[in-house]
Amino acid sequence: MSAWAAASLSRAAARCLLARGPGVRAAPPRDPRPSHPEPRGCGAAPGRTLHFTAAVPAGHNKWSKVRHIKGPKDVERSRIFSKLCLNIRLAVKEGGPNPEHNSNLANILEVCRSKHMPKSTIETALKMEKSKDTYLLYEGRGPGGSSLLIEALSNSSHKCQADIRHILNKNGGVMAVGARHSFDKKGVIVVEVEDREKKAVNLERALEMAIEAGAEDVKETEDEEERNVFKFICDASSLHQVRKKLDSLGLCSVSCALEFIPNSKVQLAEPDLEQAAHLIQALSNHEDVIHVYDNIE
């Protein structure tokens, strides 16, 4: 088992054991499959797998509170649909418009339906398969030495890069090669906190299922509608296999995708936290940006 996976499951097990009290031992985690590193660097990334984050970090630390302050519901809903459309276009570009032969597209359409996205909006995004969009991954440094990865889909890579650079420079950040080293590409399965029989699943049980399914970690999170969910993290090559196993255990998976998970985190002082939140919000508001990852604790 990799050090990352062992440490992650150990932390999750510790959380469960603290809740259960002394004298109780958790089952040992199972070895995950070997990792396959992703290429690093900025610019176009051909063959990239679809990404959509259906959940956002939850918790009671300052970053969780500052990072995810939302605007009016109608504005937030429009933003979510806009990012979903980008993901549809990317999935179609990479695997074609037929969800029966494109598992990434099938996954994102499943998320669209769960968010009650209008059918007409979905169909419009599906018809843009002939657009000259390019997937882009930019590396940056934010306030306090934080690392940022910015995913984008654009038909003008030069303009998009100039825009991203301007937003970073204006808000205490900078383009910086090397930020990718602070993240690992992992499979992420988002699961409801109730199983198919509508019975609540606690973190202890989720940890047991993570071990059984071959996941490396499980975290309690909230989705963008502030509903509690679990995030199961696994090796990228095992994503669909782990999801299938979790479903067979009676869980209700909401989505699965590849995400950049930080392998090291930084703590920021209050002024840097606020500036980082403003920077990430500004980046996220750009029409070409799919998602912004950070390693802030």
Swiss-Prot record:
Coiled coil: 191-227
HAMAP family given in the database record: Transcrip_reg_TACO1 (MF_00693)
Subcellular location: Mitochondrion
Protein name in UniProt: Translational activator of cytochrome c oxidase 1
Cellular component, GO, one term: mitochondrion
Protein family: Belongs to the TACO1 family.
Organismal lineage: Eukaryota, Metazoa, Chordata, Craniata, Vertebrata
BP GO terms, sorted: mitochondrial cytochrome c oxidase assembly; motor learning; regulation of mitochondrial translation
Compositionally biased residues, Basic and acidic residues: 28-39
GO molecular function: mitochondrial ribosome binding; mRNA binding; rRNA binding
Illness: Mitochondrial complex IV deficiency, nuclear type 8: An autosomal recessive mitochondrial disorder characterized by slowly progressive cognitive dysfunction, dystonia or visual impairment that appear after an uneventful early childhood. Additional features include gait difficulties, spasticity, dysarthria, hypotonia, and variable intellectual disability. Brain imaging shows white matter abnormalities in the basal ganglia. Serum lactate levels are increased. Patient tissues show decreased levels and activity of mitochondrial respiratory complex IV.
Keyword Coiled coil in annotation: yes
Keywords annotated in UniProt: Activator, Coiled coil, Leigh syndrome, Mitochondrion, Primary mitochondrial disease, Translation regulation
Chain residue ranges for the region called Disordered: 20-45
InterPro entries with a match to the protein in the record: Integrase-like_N, TACO1_YebC-like_2nd/3rd_dom, TACO1_YebC_N, Transcrip_reg_TACO1-like, Transcrip_reg_TACO1-like_dom3, YebC-like
Gene source species: Homo sapiens (Human)
Role: Acts as a translational activator of mitochondrially-encoded cytochrome c oxidase 1.
Domain of life: Eukaryota
